[in-house]
């Protein structure tokens, strides 16, 4: 019951923030989620005997999200005002800035490690701290970028639905008929039957959403969640995409999501904990809820930049 109640509260809030929050507020909300997830991640690594430099990590998470917000902001100027190649140059510069942030964080953490006793903990503690940046910060930071175009929120929702539906299918099919363990050392409850059901469910949901994307778009518009059409607006982002590409996208997102789930399970099992936290009744912690999304978001970006870009009009302009 707690699981259903928590989902009933969170899902509408996520959709509302995704479609209605201004870019700065949406980025701030995602940053808040990243901080909560990082806090839980540090709890897991502490349970494994490490002593992360949490305060340093939060500082560089903030710097990373500031850079990603600037990237999303200048990208939005390009899409709205037609700034042309200027935004591309700024985007490349800001992406280089993320690399500089990572390099600076690594050096700062290594310097901080000199105060560790014993000194043999300096490198491990610095390493597990640095990992929070790409694992949580940079991945969640893709959300504001993917949301920038007029169809961006719809694309992010599409991606999230693929992750959620695959997760639900894996859970119930695995419980009902699962017999062959997928990764017994990492997550004894996961089965091959559940994993296959998750892939098939994602492919089916991807095709269904593709088939009914226009009525879904009209529904979102009527609920004032999506902007009314304009001369730059295309209501169906995948309407001309071949079916094989839609299926490939859904399966790729699903496989990445399952890998993300397994990675977090490995971290928790190594620490001897069941959940990353207790913030979400019936669901565990924040990291437990976004672990799959952390791996799925980069795949979503790759498809936009490569395979789906030409069919997603605002990204290819």
Q: Language-model features: where?
A:
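Re-entrant/interfacial helical elements at transmembrane boundaries that shape
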Residues: 175-176, 267-271, 294, 298-299
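Final/C-terminal transmembrane alpha-helix of multipass membrane proteins
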Residues: 289-305
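Interfacial loop-to-transmembrane junctions
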Residues: 269-292
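Short helical (or helix-break) motifs at transmembrane helix termini and adjacent helical loops
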Residues: 165-175, 257-269
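Membrane-embedded alpha-helical bundles of polytopic integral membrane proteins
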Residues: 1-252, 315
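Hydrophobic alpha-helical transmembrane segments of integral membrane proteins
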Residues: 8-9, 277, 294-295
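Juxtamembrane boundary at the C-terminal end of a transmembrane helix
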Residues: 304-317
């Amino acid at each position: 019951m707690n699981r259903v109640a928590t989902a009933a509260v969170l899902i509408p809030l996520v959709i509302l923030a995704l479609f209605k929050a201004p870019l700065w507020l949406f980025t701030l909300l995602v940053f808040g989620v990243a901080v909560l997830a990082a806090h839980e991640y540090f709890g897991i690594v502490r349970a494994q005997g490490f002593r992360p430099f949490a305060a340093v990590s939060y500082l560089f998470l903030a710097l990373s999200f500031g850079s990603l917000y600037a990237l999303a902001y200048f990208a939005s100027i390009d899409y709205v005002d037609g700034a042309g190649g200027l935004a591309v140059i700024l985007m490349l510069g800001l992406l280089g800035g993320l690399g500089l942030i990572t390099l600076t964080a690594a050096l700062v953490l290594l310097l901080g490690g000199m105060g560790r006793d014993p000194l043999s903990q300096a490198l491990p503690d610095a390493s597990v701290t640095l990992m929070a940046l790409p694992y949580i910060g940079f991945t969640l930071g893709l959300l504001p970028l993917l949301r920038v175009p007029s169809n961006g929120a719809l694309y992010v929702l599409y991606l999230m639905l693929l992750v959620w539906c695959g997760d639900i299918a894996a859970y119930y099919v695995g419980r009902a008929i699962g017999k062959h363990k997928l990764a017994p050392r990492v997550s004894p409850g996961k089965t091959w039957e559940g994993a296959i059901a998750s892939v098939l469910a994602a492919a089916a949901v991807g095709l269904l959403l593709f088939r009914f994307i226009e009525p879904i778009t009209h529904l979102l518009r009527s609920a004032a969640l999506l902007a009314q059409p304009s001369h730059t607006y295309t209501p169906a982002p995948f309407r001309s995409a071949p079916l094989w590409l839609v299926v490939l996208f859904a399966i790729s997102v699903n496989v990445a999501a399952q890998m993300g789930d397994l990675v977090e399970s490995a971290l928790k099992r190594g620490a001897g904990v069941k959940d990353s936290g207790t913030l979400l009744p019936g669901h565990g912690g924040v990291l437990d809820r976004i672990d799959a999304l952390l791996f799925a978001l980069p795949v979503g970006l790759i498809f936009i930049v490569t395979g789906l870009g030409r069919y997603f009009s605002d990204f290819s302009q």
